């Protein structure tokens, strides 16, 4: 009976560690943020942040307006240069890697959709810049439209959509390039029911 209980306990412990990699002494963080700071003149937007985020982990940053959440995300994405510190993603120091070469996509709070493009053109924009084959682009855009439930609205322009629909366009555009890291700034701000 003791051997059986011990086996169950060991199995549960191993299962728990697999679900909580930060408890595994051998697990390597997928994202490491070390001493990250950002100064804007005399204002410290982000002050000496240290974080380890593991592969498959969902990580949320909560805080009041102006506390540095968006600035931290923008530094991870490469849109802001840290004043101090280091960002490592998948073992690679991102210090000298421009935003367009990082394995990161970001969905902005303001959506940043192109007003002169249709929904499908907005979603396909990144793939066209990567010079993917036309048939691959069509297929992936179709998958994304289905995923965000906008297939019926593919030919519409952003001004013809609700705020939540525009947000789903931005989400599809962020997901279509299959980033290793997806950063969402205020992701639930305008979603429709």
Show where each model-derived region lies.
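Conserved ABC ATPase signature
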Residues: 157-161, 165
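The feature captures the beta-strand-to-loop junction immediately N-terminal to the Walker
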Residues: 62-64
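Conserved ABC ATPase "signature" region
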Residues: 93, 128, 135-152
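Hydrophobic anchor residue at the start of the ABC signature
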Residues: 171
